[in-house]
């Protein structure tokens, strides 16, 4: 009886840990991220933004002269599941790895950093979708 109780408690504990870990690394729908690094080089001054929509669409935009402009070539359908992401903004259409830690997301391919992004409140997902 004690072994069964211990096994049940261990199962709940491991399940809870997996739930917390998997939820912490998921891309939240309708969030906007600013590109801060590309291939390890700072690009924050270029003001490039990425919106991951709940509808499976990614919108990439740049803020030129104070106006948001959609980058159609890098926008389109995306998938993100289990720490893997596939999106038009990733060259070659490859599936890359992503990891979210707090307000920072890193996208890597073969352990090489492709992008580093930070979550932002402006522009909003609504503004990005209106482009």
Regions found by a protein language model. Give the residues of each.
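C-terminal motif of bacterial Sec signal peptides marking the signal peptidase cleavage site
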Residues: 18-22
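Bacterial signal peptide processing site
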Residues: 24-26
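A glycine-anchored, Pro-Gly-centered beta-turn/N-cap motif
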Residues: 29-31, 76
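Bacterial N-terminal signal peptides that target proteins for export
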Residues: 1-9
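Bacterial N-terminal signal peptides
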Residues: 9-17
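C-terminal partner/receptor-binding element of secreted or periplasmic proteins
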Residues: 111-131
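Structural signal for glycine-centered tight turns and loop->strand junctions in beta-sheet-rich domains
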Residues: 54-58
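Contiguous, well-ordered beta-strand patches that form the walls/edges
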Residues: 38-44, 59-115
